[in-house]
Structures are given as structure tokens and as C-alpha cells.
Amino acid sequence: MTIKSDKWIKKMSQEYNMIEPFEAGQIKVSNNQKIVSYGTSSYGYDVRCADEFKIFTNINSSIVDPKNFNDKNFVDFKGDVCIIPPNSFALARTVEKFKIPRDTLVVCLGKSTYARCGIIVNVTPLEPEWEGYVTLEFSNTTPLPAKIYANEGVAQMLFFQSDEECETSYADKGGKYQGQVGVTLPKC
């Protein structure tokens, strides 16, 4: 597997709609103000999070069980800035919709701007032929509230292309997160 360059990312997005909406360059300013950058980088694509969030809460004092997840553990929030409580986390989704080629695997890494503030992003790999909006998990590892900015860069996607197509893709398996649209909670 080799990491793919900006040229490949641009071609696949413009000709095959791999990323929509797609930004061919790096956007660092919006409305004459500096923002956390998003768009195509040398060997990746910096995604934005949309303005819809699910913020983790302990109001119900329940146990977090991935096999039987209680959606009441989250508070829905819509806005330009999400404040994550100390030592807690929030879910969001990308602005961009992805359509991953059959011979490609995508790995997500956090942006240093957030990591240096104690905010960690976690996303499992985007598997071959997975399609949809990516659900993002932000962990606030600090003892203080932390901000996430909607419609600005939050994570970088790295694209790895195999020398051969996989035998069974995510679409072939009928993956449970295929085609997700909004912030998607755990499914078991």
C-alpha cells in the first residue's frame, strides 16, 4: 500500500466524487479571519466538522455499553462552536461525504492545532467502498472545557491504495455504517 498524493486526491474527487464538497487547495482564512485549515494537503485531505454535535453527559448516571447504547447519554447541540466538558467527549460528522474506491483504505489523524490543546480526534479507518459522512469523536483530555469549531478543519484523512483490490469490500459485507448521513451512534 502506498500513500496517495494531492494529485491523486484531486483526480479521484473531481472525476469520481470521492470527496464532496471538495476543496482543491488549503483554506486558511474565511470572512477575513484565520481558521483551522481544511482542504487538500500534500498527502491528505483536511476535513471539517458540521455544526451538529452530540455532547456526552452523565445526567442519567448510566453505564456506557457499546452493545446496548443509550442515546440519552448525549445532548444534541447545533451551532458554530461546540464546548466539550472537561474529561468528556462529543460526536460530530464531517461536512464532506466520502465514497471510497475498492482498492483504497483511509486513515484519519487529528490536526496538531487541536492535539496541542488536549483535544484528540478518533475515527476508525474508512474501508474500501464505504460511503457516507464520517462520524467524528472528539475527546477533551483536559480538566477545562474545550472548543471545537464547526466548518473548520478538525482532522486529516490519509489515503492508502493497495496494489490489488480486496476480495470483500465494506459494501460487499453490507457494513452497518454504510451510507450514514448524520452523527451516527454505535450499532451492534
Curated annotation (Swiss-Prot):
UniProt cross-references to InterPro entries, sorted A to Z: dCTP_deaminase, dUTPase-like_sf, dUTPase_trimeric
Active-site residue numbers: 137 (proton donor/acceptor)
Recorded metabolic or biological pathway in which this protein acts: Pyrimidine metabolism; dUMP biosynthesis; dUMP from dCTP (dUTP route): step 1/2
Reactions mediated catalytically: dCTP + H2O + H(+) = dUTP + NH4(+)
Keyword Hydrolase applies: yes
The protein's Enzyme Commission number: 3.5.4.13
Keywords, ordered alphabetically: Hydrolase, Nucleotide metabolism, Nucleotide-binding
Signal peptide: none
One Gene Ontology molecular-function label: nucleotide binding
Gene3D superfamilies, A to Z: 2.70.40.10
GO biological process, one term: dUMP biosynthetic process
Binding of dCTP, residues: 111-116, 135-137, 156, 170, 180
SUPFAM superfamilies reported for this sequence: dUTPase-like (SSF51283)
Enzyme class per UniProt: hydrolase
Pfam family for this entry, one: DCD
Taxonomic superkingdom: Bacteria
Quaternary structure and interacting proteins, as annotated: Homotrimer.
Family per similarity comment: Belongs to the dCTP deaminase family.
Function recorded in the entry: Catalyzes the deamination of dCTP to dUTP.
This protein's name: dCTP deaminase
Native source organism of the sequence: Francisella philomiragia subsp. philomiragia (strain ATCC 25017 / CCUG 19701 / FSC 153 / O#319-036)
Organism classification: Bacteria, Pseudomonadati, Pseudomonadota, Gammaproteobacteria, Thiotrichales
Gene: dcd
